[in-house]
């Protein structure tokens, strides 16, 4: 699949143009996901035919409205500010996927050096 993030959308000139470009340049791709930050972008992603719409950093109320707009026409993913405290509330809204950076943000760092590594 292809994920279109804000920088791709900005470079293409909008959600619709980014989705069209992805379909043109990568016709073999099975799914196109669009990262959205507001309800206008959600509407554009639906109209453009996105397969998955990511609801990024939205409040639960905004997510609920986005899901009404999408109305089953695309799979949905919520992302941003997902915590163990709010994930149950958010999943009850009916999104298909939840992504969370919290899983890796607090992972301990491994101090590793390859200085003394020798080629075989």
Identify the meaning behind each predicted range.
Residues 4-6, 11, 84, 105, ...:
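Generic structural "secondary-structure junction" signal
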Residues 1-62:
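Glycine- and Gly-Pro-enriched alpha-helical subdomains that act as flexible
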Residues 25-33, 66-79:
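Short beta-strand/loop segments at the ligand-binding rim of alpha/beta enzyme cores
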Residues 36, 76, 104:
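Ser/Thr-centric signal marking residues that sit
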Residues 1, 13-14, 80-81, 94, ...:
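Glycine-centered flexibility sites
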Residues 67-71, 88-93, 100-120:
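C-terminal helical cap(s) of enzyme catalytic domains, especially alpha/beta-barrels
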């Amino acid at each position: 699949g292809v994920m279109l993030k804000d920088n791709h959308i900005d470079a293409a000139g909008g959600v619709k143009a980014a989705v069209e470009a992805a379909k043109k340049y990568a016709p073999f791709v099975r799914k196109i996901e669009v990262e959205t930050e507001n309800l206008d972008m959600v509407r554009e992603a639906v109209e453009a035919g996105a397969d998955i719409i990511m609801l990024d950093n939205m409040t639960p109320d905004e997510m609920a409205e986005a899901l009404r707009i999408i109305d089953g026409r695309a799979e949905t993913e919520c992302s941003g500010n997902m915590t163990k405290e709010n994930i149950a509330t958010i999943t009850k809204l009916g999104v298909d996927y939840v992504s969370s950076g919290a899983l890796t943000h607090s992972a301990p760092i491994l101090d590793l050096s390859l200085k003394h590594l020798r080629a075989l």
